[in-house]
Amino acid sequence: MAKILTIVMLVFVSMAGWMFGADTGSIGGITNMRDFQSRYADRYDPVTDTYSYSSARQGLLVGMVNTGTTVGCLLSSPLGDRFGKRKCIMGWTLVYITGVIVQLTTIPSWVQMMVAKIWTGLGIGALSVIAPGYQSESSPPHIRGAIVTTYQLFITLGIFIAACINMGTHKYTTHPEAQWRVPIGINLLWGILMFFGMLFLPESPRYLAVKGRNEECMKILTRNAGLPADHPIMQKEYNAIQADVEAELAGGPCSWPQIFSNEIRYRTLLGMGVMAFQQLTGNNYFFYYGTQVFRGTGLNSPFLAALILDAVNFGCTFGAIFVLEYFGRRGPLIVGGVWQSICFFIYASVGDRALTRPNGTSNHRAGAVMIVFSCLFIFSFAQTWAPAAYVIVGESYPIRYRSKCAAVATASNWFWNFMISFFTPFISNSIGFKYGYVFAACNLCAAIIIFLFAKETKGLTLEEINQLYLSNIKPWNTGAYQRDREDIKQSDSEKERGPTSKLHEYVEHAPNSYASTHSTESENYPQQVTNPVGL
């Protein structure tokens, strides 16, 4: 069993998620604060004494952070390969801190605020790749899913805390600029904690193995697992890492085009698709524009409604730690996609057909129904698509390709994040709550994609996952492999053989087996991959 201290250290890396969540959770409320609007909005109505934004300006203020995050994702890969994940986490945290300082000290120029958000996004985007990758590579297999899930848990905690801060500051009148400067200033604290905390954490053991620092690699593995170096489990894990490193690096450094080669293209596109659909579920429709959306339902306190939604998001994410470890990855993603599609369909139908009365006033009962189904959507999203997307990307790639594949997958996430955050004002102003039908369709498509393409990886080591994807086992049959694997674990003789040979046995007897077309020697690291569903 992993030491408690190791678990705490790995969970601490999820502070990167908190930084991301704090930015996401604060911007929606900040753009609706009067002092901020008086400085950066481009419309003023003297009759009502209110400020408002054009769709373009609001989209840029909210969404441009995601252009920075997309670039940060792509930059994270070469720097992570060269300097290691620990040093890069610290470096990108400094980039984040710098961006927050510029936001905090900006003059009344919306362009300067936008540029500061882009700079902040560079740090957030890079950390969204490196931090879950560090956790995946450093965690013992039996708790890896739970550890990486804490990254999403901390995102939701950051969103919730930011909403609480917004709720407490949006009515400041003595020093009105404190309405939005306090939420932004507090975000500095999370970056500072992250930077100094990383001083006490070790480097990823798999990165050390790649660099030939084998003694340090074994030392960290044994410390993380709480077992001596001569323990059979440690020897098997260490030998598996060494074999994987030697095989994956035999072809030399990985170039960007190679992540779309036959050997890895299937997983590259899967990761990009999963991360894209995590955004296309529509979660950030609520997190970025929740305050504005709920104001449209006629509520007197849209800040409170957004806070309730964020609280549901945070509370339900605790369930994800259990869901992903007990039910795996495929099942929750499929069920979650269908559930979320239903929620958005009802949300859009009520908003489009029942929210506004013939006399133009809001139907508060319809508004309450919309909030309920918004919460039911978040109930599902927080336990399925929110954490599982990061888990899949963090554990699906072999060492040689891992940093670049994770970078392009996460860049896909941030690209669609930008598309939604920027175009939502335009679309909402055009079709109103019918926008929800788009997300309902996307959620249903996401469930189908997972059923057809994603393999079940619960409880496998990173090396076993690599071999599973190299096999011809159909994605919808990998659940059967998991059940067989649990049965095999009951046999003492099979325990002595080690987890890798268990996978080999299943592959040898699987339909359309990979083993039938490859020799035993080449089975571990084949040069050509037959994609199970034709990608």
Curated annotation (Swiss-Prot):
UniProt keyword annotation of Membrane present: yes
Compositional bias per record (Basic and acidic residues), positions renumbered to this chain: 484-508
Q: Where is the composition biased (Polar residues)?
A: 513-535
The free-text function statement in the UniProt record for this protein reads: High-affinity fructose transporter.
Annotated glycosylation sites? 359
Q: Which residues cross the membrane?
A: 10-30, 59-79, 88-108, 113-133, 145-165, 182-202, 269-287, 304-324, 331-351, 366-386, 407-427, 435-455
Which residue ranges are assigned to the Cytoplasmic compartment in the record's topology? 1-9, 80-87, 134-144, 203-268, 325-330, 387-406, 456-535
Which Gene3D superfamilies did the record assign?
A: MFS general substrate transporter like domains
Q: Which Pfam families match?
A: Sugar_tr (PF00083)
Outline the segment boundaries, as ranges, of region: Disordered: 484-535
Q: Please list the residue ranges that the record places on the Extracellular side of the membrane.
A: 31-58, 109-112, 166-181, 288-303, 352-365, 428-434
What GO terms describe the biological role, i.e. biological process, of this protein?
Answer: carbohydrate transmembrane transport; carbohydrate transport; meiotic cell cycle
Q: Which UniProt keywords apply?
A: Glycoprotein, Meiosis, Membrane, Sugar transport, Transmembrane, Transmembrane helix, Transport
Q: How does the entry describe its membrane topology? A: Multi-pass membrane protein
Q: Does the keyword Cytoplasm apply?
A: no
Q: Where in the cell is it found?
A: Membrane
Q: What is an example of a GO molecular function annotated in this UniProt entry? A: carbohydrate:proton symporter activity
**What InterPro entries does its record include?**
MFS_dom, MFS_sugar_transport-like, MFS_Sugar_Transporters, MFS_trans_sf, Sugar/inositol_transpt, Sugar_transporter_CS
Q: Which family does it belong to?
A: Belongs to the major facilitator superfamily. Sugar transporter (TC 2.A.1.1) family.
Q: Which Gene Ontology CC terms are recorded? A: cell division site; cell tip; fungal-type vacuole; plasma membrane
| Name of the protein this chain belongs to | High-affinity fructose transporter ght6
- Spell out the disulfide connections: none
